[in-house]
Each structure stands twice: as structure tokens, then as C-alpha cells.
Amino acid sequence: MASPSRRLQTKPVITCFKSVLLIYTFIFWITGVILLAVGIWGKVSLENYFSLLNEKATNVPFVLIATGTVIILLGTFGCFATCRASAWMLKLYAMFLTLIFLVELVAAIVGFVFRHEIKNSFKNNYEKALKQYNSTGDYRSHAVDKIQNTLHCCGVTDYRDWTDTNYYSEKGFPKSCCKLEDCTPQRDADKVNNEGCFIKVMTIIESEMGVVAGISFGVACFQLIGIFLAYCLSRAITNNQYEIV
């Protein structure tokens, strides 16, 4: 059995670690809420862009939503484990944090490696959407119209991309290409936006995904602090229990 003075020295350390870990866990829980919000925002605001990418890319917002939800649940568990001062629960908390950190790290590496494929996928699918465009409104045609209306652009590289499509042969440029709402006749190139959409869309995606990547990277690095704190508190609690015995 350890001396009473030794146990008195250990208890303030445990109290200090508990206080810091509780503050950390609360902030960690907030980051989960932020990731959840970013995922929902990405699903709503970037849906038109994602719909012209491959199916894997459309899952990005859902991955963020799922990650945010897991972090919220894990943060709640971490708070409970800290308040209970349970060594095994804190070790489990640290293990989960490590697992999520590794998953986020792998996801970031994969996203960086395949970033050029995302550009090529978008360009190819946008060109295909133009070839198959119809005004009745399948989801890709709707995405094309939404992008061209919002960004004031026309075609992939420029407005001339439309001249090779069946839609142009029958009806001319789509209304979403028009500089004004009424640009009849719709074959008049002077009345449509000349700039292509590809460069504009890539600029937006890189900007918005940069925000998402920055937040995700910050959360991942922040988890290292939690792993360290949870491990230290667990060890301090275990040592204190050993000293009592």
C-alpha cells in the first residue's frame, strides 16, 4: 500500500486530467456537430456538382454526416467515461479515437491521390450530360441547367460544346445558357454566356472542398490530444487504484 501522502499527490493529477479531458471532450463533441452540419450543407449546396461525378463522389457528404454522428456519440461516451473515472472505458475511448484518426488519415490520403480523377470524372460526365440533355428534366439535365444558371456559363469548355449535341440541332442553346431570360432565337451565340462551366465548377469545388478538408484535418489532429489525455487519465486512475491496494 502506498503512503497517504503519495495518494494525495495522485488525486490532484487525476482531477486536473479529468477537467482538461472534459473540456476537450466537449470541444470534440462540438466538432462532431460541425462535421455533421458541413455534411448536410455539402449535400444541399453541392448536390448539383456531385450528381455529375461518379457514385463514389456523391457519398462524400454522407461520409461527413456519418463521421459527425459517430463523433457526437463518441464524445458523449467520452464525457461519461471521464465523469465515471473508469480506466477501461477511457482506454476504450482512446482506442476509438485512434481508430477514427486512422480512418480519416487514410480517407485524406485517398482523396489527395485521386483528386485528378475527380476532375476527369466531372468533365467526362458533364460532356455526357450535354450529349444526352433534354428539357424534360432528368437529374443530370437538371444539374446542367442549375450549374449554367448559377454560374452564368455555357457548355464544358465554352458555348460551342452545345453545337455538337442533338438538343442544339433541334432547339438551339438551352435557356440556361441565355444571358437574359428570353434569348430568342436560341441559336444566336451573342445572346448566350460564352464561358464554359468546367473551370468555374472546378474552382468552386476546390474552394469548398478545401474548407471541408481543412475542417477534417483540424478534427483529425485534435483527436491526437484526446488520445493522449484519455491514456494519461486512464493510467493515473490505474496507478491510484494500485496505490490504494
Swiss-Prot record:
The keyword Chaperone does not apply. It is a multi-pass membrane protein. Keywords: Glycoprotein, Membrane, Transmembrane, Transmembrane helix. Glycans are attached at residue 134. The chain crosses the membrane at residues 20-40, 60-80, 94-114, 209-229. Residues 1-19, 81-93, 230-245 are cytoplasmic. It comes from Pongo abelii (Sumatran orangutan). It comes from the Eukaryota. This is Tetraspanin-6. Belongs to the tetraspanin (TM4SF) family. The lineage of its organism: Eukaryota, Metazoa, Chordata, Craniata, Vertebrata. Its main location: membrane. The gene is TSPAN6. One of its GO terms (cellular component) is plasma membrane. Residues 41-59, 115-208 are extracellular. CDD domains: TM4SF2_6_like_LEL. It is found in: Membrane. The keyword Transmembrane helix applies.
